[in-house]
Amino acid sequence: MGQPAKVLQLFKTLHRTRQQVFKNDKRALEAARVKINEEFKKHKNETSPEKIKEMLKIGSDVELLLRTSVIQGIHTDHDTLQLVPRKDLLTENVPYCDAPTQKL
């Protein structure tokens, strides 16, 4: 896949992730939309393949960070937040054992 196609794919992926992560939060959706568009417009005339590759890596890292680390909180009271995790962030409880396993 050529670099222009990769750039367009990353642009679309970032916007899809933005819509999932900030669902029902108009202010965050708009701020993320503006920031994504601003960063892509700022670098639209970049021609160096190395620089483009570096920026693609940064964009992919940002998308991964948004998808795996951001969780929404809703103000329910003066000093209370209700966390609203997405289903893809929830994991099953895994038993933890801090005793080392013995090999025979």
Swiss-Prot record:
<keyword id="KW-0496">Mitochondrion</keyword>
<dbReference type="GO" id="GO:0045333">
    <property type="term" value="P:cellular respiration"/>
</dbReference>
<dbReference type="InterPro" id="IPR008011">
    <property type="entry name" value="Complex1_LYR_dom"/>
</dbReference>
<protein>
    <recommendedName>
        <fullName>Complex III assembly factor LYRM7</fullName>
    </recommendedName>
</protein>
<dbReference type="Pfam" id="PF05347">
    <property type="entry name" value="Complex1_LYR"/>
</dbReference>
<dbReference type="GO" id="GO:0044183">
    <property type="term" value="F:protein folding chaperone"/>
</dbReference>
<comment type="subunit">
    <text>Interacts with UQCRFS1.</text>
</comment>
<dbReference type="GO" id="GO:0005759">
    <property type="term" value="C:mitochondrial matrix"/>
</dbReference>
<dbReference type="GO" id="GO:0031966">
    <property type="term" value="C:mitochondrial membrane"/>
</dbReference>
<feature type="modified residue" description="Phosphoserine">
    <location>
        <position position="60"/>
    </location>
</feature>
<dbReference type="InterPro" id="IPR045298">
    <property type="entry name" value="Complex1_LYR_LYRM7"/>
</dbReference>
<keyword id="KW-0597">Phosphoprotein</keyword>
<comment type="function">
    <text>Assembly factor required for Rieske Fe-S protein UQCRFS1 incorporation into the cytochrome b-c1 (CIII) complex. Functions as a chaperone, binding to this subunit within the mitochondrial matrix and stabilizing it prior to its translocation and insertion into the late CIII dimeric intermediate within the mitochondrial inner membrane.</text>
</comment>
<comment type="similarity">
    <text>Belongs to the complex I LYR family.</text>
</comment>
<keyword id="KW-0143">Chaperone</keyword>
<dbReference type="InterPro" id="IPR050435">
    <property type="entry name" value="MZM1/LYRM7"/>
</dbReference>
<dbReference type="GO" id="GO:0034551">
    <property type="term" value="P:mitochondrial respiratory chain complex III assembly"/>
</dbReference>
